[in-house]
Amino acid sequence: MKKLVVGALTVSTLLLNNVSATETLKDIHLTGISSTAADIDASEIGIGYGVSVYLDNSIFWGVSFDFSGGTLDNSQIKIENKTSTKNDNSLYNAGGDFKLGYALFNNKLALYGIGSAFYQGIGGIDGAGLGYGAGVDYRITDNIALNVEYKTYSMTSNYGDYDYDRISTGIKYTFK
């Protein structure tokens, strides 16, 4: 593992040598989310803040912090043969993402992978987990971008482990 980390740092240092940021953008974004938590479908709406850096070699990276909330289609949550007795169909989330990818067409289109950490309240049960995914951002103007992201998480809660999957579509207002 140590050799892998040292190798990755060496390669990234060589690739990013003499590379500078051509553009750094901050954004505020709104998202509509369709998700599945513990095998129960949910609808959510979210808001977030992010920073994206476009390098002159077309590498794109960014971080974002998001909050979302919504409702589950069913209030009976079953995780590892334990059923929640709470009559609560609420869902709320807070998370952070790291994005790394490639920007095309003068930074109008960004394709990226996502690594994510997440906290979730699902029907009165708290959970946390790590996840991964992929996304696409398309800037329709200098200040407006549309995006689509898919993420999947392995969550751990006091009731046991469960999966959380989400696909989101959003609009971003970007500024420097």
Regions found by a protein language model. Give the residues of each.
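Cleavable N-terminal export/targeting peptides
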Residues: 1-25
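Short glycine/proline- and aromatic-enriched beta-strand/turn motifs that initiate or cap beta-hairpins
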Residues: 19-59, 67, 119, 174-176
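Membrane-embedded beta-strand positions of outer-membrane beta-barrel proteins
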Residues: 26-32, 63-65, 96-98, 111-115, ...
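Flexible, solvent-exposed loop segments that connect beta-strands
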Residues: 34-40, 68-92, 117-128, 154-165
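Hydrophobic, lipid-facing positions within transmembrane beta-strands of outer-membrane proteins
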Residues: 43-49, 92-98, 130-134, 165-169
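Repeated loop/turn-to-beta-strand initiation elements of outer-membrane beta-barrel proteins
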Residues: 56-61, 106-111, 138, 142-148, ...
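Outer-membrane beta-barrel "beta-signal"
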Residues: 138, 163-176
